Design a protein with these regions (language model features):
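Transmembrane helix-loop-helix hairpins at membrane boundaries of multipass inner-membrane proteins
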Residues: 1-83, 155-174, 230-232, 241-244, ...
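Hydrophobic alpha-helical membrane-insertion segments
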Residues: 1-12, 142-151, 354-358, 445-460, ...
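Hydrophobic core segments of alpha-helical transmembrane domains in multi-pass membrane transport
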Residues: 2-4, 60-61, 150-151, 183-186, ...
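Hydrophobic alpha-helical transmembrane segments
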Residues: 36-57, 176-188, 388-391, 476-494
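Hydrophobic transmembrane alpha-helices and their helix-loop junctions in integral membrane proteins
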Residues: 63-104, 113-426, 432
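Short phosphate-coordinating micro-motif centered on Lys-Gly-acidic
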Residues: 109
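Cytoplasmic/organellar membrane-interface segments at the starts of transmembrane helices
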Residues: 341-349, 402-491, 498, 502-533
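Residue-level detector of conserved catalytic or cofactor/ligand-binding positions
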Residues: 534-542
Length: 543
């Protein structure tokens, strides 16, 4: 409620004379004074993107907290779970309202610790313990680059603050700013699971499913995007080449993750790679901005932030829907599902809404934000535009492959033992002959997020969030929009033809025909194995 009240008061306040919203610091104290002109403060910064993030984090976190009452009921460590969940939320809220980059780094590390605790919540499972360690180590490696970048930036810029006036007036050493920003992006790439630092995120599915919703929608993985957006004035002004590198890394990551998602059988891992791909879209949107744009790259920046907002809602809906399904069938594998629409109508409809949104079908929210990204990409270069359009088509395909595998086709044999994630007999295992709809504590958040997913696209987002602070009028490019809609519909039609029925001869024939490629994609193109071999080689003594 406090976040909503803050957002209401902030965005309803009169704009400044130059048409921008005021940047406010309602609280700020000096924490570590170094010199008369250089110190580290602790405080609260309110500007359009921090206030927008307050809404995103608070909304998704509230839904996850409510949902968890039903999902985690009867679990051992129930109180511990809520303590870790609240720490996670607090850490992300502290990160987005930080007044300076050192304060951001403090909460950045708290986000990492919180994710470690939640991913390893089932600490008696060796796979969960290994996944939590993997996430912690990979992101700590990336955070070393972030910390070095902060130190380089502070030394040469003479400031750590996020105040626009001070960021615009660097005291010297501007030639070192690209290096500092590049190092900071390494930290952002680790948190946001950009290739090749993405390897921790699929394994993070070992945590409880509501935790996955919070990590993927509103906390850890969007922290890297928020970092690039927060430092955007410096990227666009001093390091445009580094900003373009952000776009290229994001595009490759989006394609790689979409390719892997097309063949996964674990529903949470499909959604995990979907998240990696969609974060790639946000990075591309920020990266294709150029200083030559009269609005200082306004379209890409606005589109990236808009997609962060819409994605948070429909991705939380997808993960919570997946949790409802796992709660019913006690398995993450699509082979244990099929025909569930008959037994879980609320989960079915809400999950379908989220699939339509991420596929970019109007009037759902993902259509509006994704098409603004595609328009920005085409303005940057036709090649980038077509590449991202192709990845959007892959997104529609693998999401409806997932949808049909869960809710259509033949009714799969029901599991006789609970999945590793659950320790409490419920659903089938409690003597119910068929899967059943989840309790109200779980379905109410699904319905709420479904409504938000439908209406969020109609928010005049550019009126509130833009790169230079002034209102940005959104105009759909109907050539781009029409093309992307047509491609999305074709992709959905292909997925329907291949996966809607119980027997899938076309899908099976293609898997046999391209077995090598299918196997490589299923095993994530062996990136994890390559890391393991490299580390073993490095750790062995030279003979």
């Amino acid at each position: 409620l406090l976040s909503y009240a803050t957002a209401w008061q902030y965005f309803s306040a009169p704009r400044l004379a130059d048409g921008t919203f005021a940047t406010l610091m309602p609280y700020n104290v000096t924490w570590l004074p170094f010199t008369p002109t250089l110190s580290i403060d602790l405080g609260i910064l309110l500007d359009p993107i921090s206030v927008m993030m307050l809404i995103v984090i608070s909304t998704v976190s509230l839904m996850v907290h409510v949902y968890s009452f039903g999902y985690m009921k009867g679990e051992r460590g129930f109180q511990r779970y809520y303590a870790f969940l609240s720490l996670f939320t607090m850490s992300m809220l502290g990160l987005v309202v930080a007044t300076n980059i050192f304060q951001m780094y403090l909460f950045w590390e708290l986000v990492g610790v919180s994710s470690y605790l939640l991913i390893g919540f089932y600490y008696t499972k060796p796979s969960a313990v290994a996944a939590s360690k993997k996430a912690f180590i990979v992101t700590r490696f990336a955070d070393l680059g972030f910390l070095i970048g902060i130190l380089v930036y502070g030394y040469y810029a003479g400031t750590y603050t996020f105040q626009p006036s001070e960021m615009a007036l660097l005291k010297g050493g501007a030639t070192m700013i690209p290096l500092a920003l590049g190092l900071m992006f390494i930290g952002g790439a680790g948190k946001s699971a950009m290739f090749p630092l993405h390897i921790w995120l699929p394994d993070a599915m070992e945590g409880p499913t509501p935790v996955s919703a919070l990590i993927h929608a509103a906390t850890m993985v969007v922290a890297g995007v928020y970092l690039v957006a927060r430092m955007f004035p410096l990227f666009i002004g001093y390091a445009p080449d580094v900003l373009h590198l952000v776009a290229y890394v994001g595009a490759f990551t989006a394609f790689y993750a979409a390719s892997v998602a097309c063949v996964q059988s674990d529903i949470k891992r499909v959604l995990a790679f979907s998240t990696i791909s969609q974060i790639g879209f946000m990075m591309v949107a920020l990266g294709v901005c150029t200083s030559a744009d009269p609005h200082h790259g306004g379209l890409g920046y606005m589109a990236g932030m808009f997609h962060l907002f819409t994605h948070a809602m429909f991705k939380a809906l997808l993960f919570l829907g997946a949790g409802s399904i796992i709660h019913a069938v006690h398995s993450n594998e699509m082979s244990a599902m099929g025909g569930l629409r008959k037994y879980m109508p609320v989960t079915h409809i809400t999950f379908l809404i989220a699939c339509l949104a991420i596929a970019g079908i109007p009037p759902f929210s993902g259509f509006f934000s994704k098409d603004e990204i595609l328009t920005a990409c085409f303005q940057f270069s036709p090649a980038m535009g077509w590449i991202m359009t192709a990845i959007a088509a892959m997104t529609a395909f693998y999401m409806f492959r997932l949808y049909y595998g869960i809710f259509w086709g033949g009714v799969a044999p029901r599991q006789e033992s609970p999945s590793d994630e659950s320790h409490t007999p419920h659903g089938n295992l409690a003597g119910v002959p068929h899967p059943h709809e989840s309790p109200l504590a779980m379905t109410i958040p699904l319905m709420f997020l479904a409504v938000v997913t439908i209406v969020a696209g109609f928010i005049p987002f550019g009126k509130f969030i833009s790169s230079n602070g002034t209102a940005y009028e959104i105009h759909l490019d109907w050539t781009v929009a029409g093309t992307s809609i047509a491609i999305a519909v074709i992709s959905i039609a292909i997925a329907t033809a291949m996966y809607a029925r119980a027997k899938q001869p076309v899908a099976n024939a293609l898997a046999r025909r391209f077995r090598g490629l299918w196997t490589a994609a299923y095993h994530r193109f062996y990136i994890d194995e390559a890391y393991q071999l490299s580390l073993i080689h490095i750790s062995e003594p030279t003979r």
